[in-house]
């Protein structure tokens, strides 16, 4: 059996998990509600304060879906209890971010400012002009929006200018050597 898939998911106090037909899982918690349709082949059962995912047979596809389904439910439970966040840092002369309502305006050395709208269920918080925190209860949406912000100006290897994750390490390169 899948090692991740067979681990039961603990449901903390204050969180409810409901499984409707066609494996539509709804997780309600202190931070909000998440719902998602999971693969119909998997058997999802709520047993007391745990959720158990089982698979019908040993086909490779079923083994893959087993671990995936369990992890998606675990991420939903974590999201409604503690939430997710990603921290981005902006490096570079004149590079900065500004927030106006739900709009994030990035000045990244282009001839125009880059304006991004926060998606539903995700919020951005600015700490100073060069630190952006993306927060939300849906892990996928938080990661996707953080990646979209980073893609507006990826860090370059010579000076490290651009937008990077706070825990990301940029491999630096040595520039050209001048003539002697």
From Swiss-Prot:
InterPro entries, per database record: Ribosomal_uL6-like (IPR000702), Ribosomal_uL6-like_a/b-dom_sf (IPR036789), Ribosomal_uL6_a/b-dom (IPR020040), Ribosomal_uL6_bac-type (IPR019906), Ribosomal_uL6_CS (IPR002358)
Keywords: Ribonucleoprotein, Ribosomal protein, RNA-binding, rRNA-binding
GO-annotated biological processes: cytoplasmic translation
Entry keyword Nuclease: no
Keyword rRNA-binding found: yes
Gene3D superfamilies according to UniProt: Ribosomal protein L6, alpha-beta domain (3.90.930.12)
Function: This protein binds to the 23S rRNA, and is important in its secondary structure. It is located near the subunit interface in the base of the L7/L12 stalk, and near the tRNA binding site of the peptidyltransferase center.
HAMAP family assigned to the protein according to its UniProt record, in alphabetical order: Ribosomal_uL6_B (MF_01365_B)
UniProt protein name: Large ribosomal subunit protein uL6
Organism the protein comes from: Lachnoclostridium phytofermentans (strain ATCC 700394 / DSM 18823 / ISDg)
Taxonomic placement: Bacteria, Bacillati, Bacillota, Clostridia, Lachnospirales
Gene: rplF
């Amino acid at each position: 059996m899948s090692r991740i898939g067979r681990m039961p998911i603990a449901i903390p106090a204050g969180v409810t998990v409901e499984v409707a037909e066609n494996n539509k899982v709804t997780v309600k918690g202190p931070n909000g509600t998440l719902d998602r349709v999971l693969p119909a082949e998997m058997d999802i059962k709520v047993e007391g304060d745990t959720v158990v995912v089982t698979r019908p047979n040993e086909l490779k596809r079923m083994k893959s879906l087993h671990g995936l389904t369990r992890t998606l439910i675990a991420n939903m439970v974590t999201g409604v209890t503690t939430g997710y966040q990603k921290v981005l840092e902006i490096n570079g002369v004149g590079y900065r971010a500004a927030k106006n309502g739900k709009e994030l305006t990035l000045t990244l050395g282009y001839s125009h400012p880059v304006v991004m709208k926060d998606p539903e269920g995700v919020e951005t918080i600015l700490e100073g002009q060069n630190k952006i925190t993306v927060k939300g209860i849906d892990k996928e949406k938080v990661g996707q929006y953080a990646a979209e912000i980073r893609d507006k100006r990826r860090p370059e290897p010579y000076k490290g200018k651009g937008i990077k994750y706070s825990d990301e390490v940029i491999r630096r390169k040595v520039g050209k050597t001048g003539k002697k």
